[in-house]
Regions:
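A short SAM/SAH-binding and catalytic strip from SAM-dependent methyltransferases
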Residues: 73-92
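A short acidic, Gly/Pro-enriched loop at the edge of an enzyme's catalytic core
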Residues: 66-74
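Core SAM-dependent methyltransferase catalytic element
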Residues: 150-165
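Class I SAM-dependent methyltransferase SAM/SAH-binding core
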Residues: 14, 20-58
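Short alpha-helix
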Residues: 127-142
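Conserved SAM/SAH-binding loop
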Residues: 61-65
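Conserved beta-strand signature within the Rossmann-like core of class I S-adenosyl-L-methionine
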Residues: 106-114
Length: 165
């Protein structure tokens, strides 16, 4: 959804929290100009590199906040779910900090997901948020179109932010 299907040119993609590179199964590799997966878990990156050694993709242990490169699109799936012992307030601050970085390093847009607070179960170590709490923060970003998908997977909201300029 984040990638403009009308545009037939190749694009670069940063996969934040890539794990072992599962997102690649859903990518048309012929369309990728460059793919970079980053994660903070060494074992995941080692596995991703072994699994994808014959592809023109890169996986590295890297901190998102030290990322200097620009990418057409930034995708982040699943890293805003587990908060462990962090407070909800600190987790929300982390989510917003990540969004600021996605905005800074993406040229065309970014996507991420969060768990909705309207669930029929809750766990202390998971992070839930009402999407309306993120909307004002996202709407403050200049020249963006925001799409929220809450129907694809129960209890999750997917945010697709396209840069319009």
């Amino acid at each position: 959804r984040i990638i403009d299907k009308k545009n037939q040119s190749k694009f670069s993609l940063l996969d934040v929290g890539c794990g072992y590179g599962e997102l690649l199964k859903h990518c048309n590799l012929k369309k990728l100009k460059a793919y970079q997966g980053i994660d903070i878990v060494h074992e995941m990156i080692t596995h991703a590199n072994k699994k994808n050694k014959n592809r023109k993709v890169k996986f590295n242990v890297r901190n998102l906040f030290e990322e200097k490169n620009k990418y057409d699109y930034v995708i982040c799936n699943g890293i805003f779910t587990l908060k462990s012992t962090i407070s909800n307030k600190k987790m929300l601050t982390f989510v917003k900090r990540c969004i600021n970085q996605f905005y800074k390093i993406s040229l065309k847009g970014f996507a991420f997901n969060v768990m909705d607070e309207k669930v029929d179960f809750k766990s202390k170590d998971l992070f839930y948020i009402n999407s309306n709490k993120l909307l004002p923060f996202l709407e403050n970003k200049q020249n963006v179109k925001i799409i929220i998908d809450s129907k694809t997977i129960d209890y999750e909201n997917y945010f697709f932010i396209k840069k319009t300029k």
